[in-house]
UniProtKB/Swiss-Prot annotation:
It comes from Rattus norvegicus (Rat). Homodimer; disulfide-linked. Forms trimer, hexamers and higher molecular weight oligomers. May form heteromeric complexes with C1QTNF2 and C1QTNF12 and, to a lesser extent, with C1QTNF5 and C1QTNF10. Interacts with BMP5 and BMP7; the interaction inhibits BMP-induced transcription of HAMP. Interacts with BMP6; the interaction inhibits BMP-induced transcription of HAMP. Interacts with BMP2. Interacts with heterodimers composed of BMP2 and BMP6 in vitro, the interaction inhibits the heterodimer binding to its receptor BMPR1A/ALK3 and thereby suppresses expression of HAMP. One of its GO terms (biological process) is negative regulation of autophagy. SUPFAM superfamilies: TNF-like. The keyword Coiled coil does not apply. The gene is Erfe. Residues 84-97 have a biased composition (Basic residues). Glycans are attached at residues 230, 282, 293, 320. InterPro entries: Adipolin/Erythroferrone-rel, C1q_dom, Tumour_necrosis_fac-like_dom. Residues 1-24 form the signal peptide. N-glycosylated; required for secretion of the mature protein. This is Erythroferrone. Keywords: Disulfide bond, Glycoprotein, Hormone, Hydroxylation, Secreted, Signal.
């Protein structure tokens, strides 16, 4: 059966195989002249087959061939540059996502109130602050004394600190006042007094009476500092010019009940503290009290601030503008203190 095959069919199959091999090797079209096409071999002519052991001859197609994979990778790398860069795209996308700032939102709800701090806790914190201030002040004074006097004895606790730790809450405030009074920044009171009326004084009706004959009580809280007080005349002369706080309190007893009937406009008392005994011409402190609803024993007081020149005196006057006499009881007091210049 093999001998019956025609040699023309074999040659056709061999030509097709050669064409497929040429296409597999990537023979470019530019290797042939333009306009020429591969023509099949005419029948009857057979190309000699190359030996099997000989290596393939080099062709021009290998010098001009391009690997499809390398071309694709080069295209991918070049596509990430320029306008197609991923960094530029991300930045642009972020800018677009931010957009324009909108209006501020409404305020949030109010927070819960803070914790309630009882007064006991606040007082304890105040005590701690006071202890620190006292310790700092005492240590400063101790260092100052060490610079001027030799050291003596071993270290001992401050008496002010010991007293502070042993006192209760009420004593802490008293200690604070004492510390402020002892502080060099607290001004010293140069003039002050507190005196009382020695005996009862009779004041007739429709009369203006200047009170006198005082004494200095020997009780806790009584004070006298500086000159100027005349206990006999009841006049206090200002040792220096300045502002003085003055006060007077009288205990008054009616010796005779006022006449019956409707109260009269003149049935009243005036308590005054005058300068130079000129109550009408100079500034004075005054209190007015009606007698229509008063009892047999009552109290009338006056207080305020006057500016006194050096050498000017003040005194207490009682104006009995009523229809009956009265008595100012002993123990009524008169006081003054220099506030400042």
């Amino acid at each position: 059966m093999a001998s019956t095959r025609s040699p023309g069919g074999a040659r056709t199959l061999l030509a097709c195989a050669s064409l497929l091999a040429a296409m597999g090797l990537g023979v470019p079209e530019s290797a042939e002249p333009v306009g020429t096409q591969a023509r099949p071999q005419p029948p009857g002519t057979e190309l000699p087959a190359p030996p099997a052991h000989s290596p393939p001859e080099p062709t021009i197609a290998h010098a001009h061939s391009v690997d499809p994979r390398d071309a694709w990778m080069l295209f991918v790398k070049q596509s990430d540059k320029g306008i197609n860069s991923k960094k530029r795209s991300r930045t642009k996308a972020r800018r677009l996502k931010l957009g324009l700032p909108g209006p501020p939102g409404p305020p949030g709800p109010q927070g819960p109130p803070g914790p309630f701090i009882p007064s006991e806790v606040l007082l304890k914190e105040f005590q701690l602050l006071l202890k620190g201030a006292v310790r700092q002040r005492e240590s400063t004074e101790h260092c100052t004394r060490d610079l001027t006097t030799p050291a003596s004895g071993g270290p001992s606790r401050d008496p002010v600190t010991q007293e502070l730790e042993s006192q209760d809450q009420g004593a802490v405030l008293a200690l604070l006042a004492a510390t402020l009074a002892q502080s060099p920044r607290a001004p010293r009171v140069e003039a002050a007094f507190h005196c009382r009326l020695r005996r009862d004084v009779q004041v007739e009706r429709r009369a203006l009476h200047e009170l006198g004959v005082y004494y200095l009580p020997e009780v806790e809280g009584a004070f006298r500092r500086g000159p100027g007080l005349n206990l006999t005349s009841g006049q206090y002369t200002a040792p220096v010019a300045g502002f003085y706080a003055l006060a007077a309190t009288l205990h008054v007893a009616l010796t005779k009940q006022p006449r019956k009937g409707p109260p009269q406009p003149r049935d009243r008392l005036r308590l005054l503290i005058c300068i130079q005994s000129l109550c009408q011409h100079n500034a004075s402190l005054e209190t007015v009290m009606g007698l229509e609803n008063s009892s047999e024993l009552f109290t009338i007081s006056v207080n305020g601030v006057l500016y006194l020149q050096t050498g000017h005196y003040t005194s207490v006057f009682l104006d009995n503008a009523s229809g009956s006499s009265l008595t100012v009881r002993g123990g009524s007091h008169f006081s003054a203190i220099l506030l400042g210049l």
